[in-house]
Amino acid sequence: MGFGGISLWQLLIVLAIIVLLFGTKKLRGIGGDLGGAVKGFKKAMSDEKNTDKEKPEQIQKSEESAPLDSAHTEKNKDNNKV
């Protein structure tokens, strides 16, 4: 018994038929495309983790700049009174 009731010989026969149908060059190209897609996915996931680490720093910077924004709005209120 192999994988889910499929024996090793059956897997080899299916693999041989696939190679005969598509050829080795086409299978190599498909494998390269699949590998590139996996590599891109892993890179995107690592970039996502890096942006998650940067978010607390950005929040802290925005809290520090908040008093500047409130001072600016007070000037606008004074200008509106005139």
Swiss-Prot record:
Q: Which family does it belong to?
A: Belongs to the TatA/E family.
* Protein's membrane topology: Single-pass membrane protein
Any Pfam family = TatA_B_E
Among the entry's GO cellular component annotations, what is one? TAT protein transport complex
Write out the biased-composition intervals (Basic and acidic residues): 44-64, 71-82
Where is this chain's protein located in or outside the cell? Cell inner membrane
Phylogenetic lineage = Bacteria, Pseudomonadati, Pseudomonadota, Gammaproteobacteria, Alteromonadales
- What name is this protein filed under? Sec-independent protein translocase protein TatA
Claim: Cell membrane is one of the keywords in the record: yes
Q: What does this protein do?
A: Part of the twin-arginine translocation (Tat) system that transports large folded proteins containing a characteristic twin-arginine motif in their signal peptide across membranes. TatA could form the protein-conducting channel of the Tat system.
Organism of this sequence:
Pseudoalteromonas translucida (strain TAC 125)
User: Mainly resides where?
Assistant: membrane
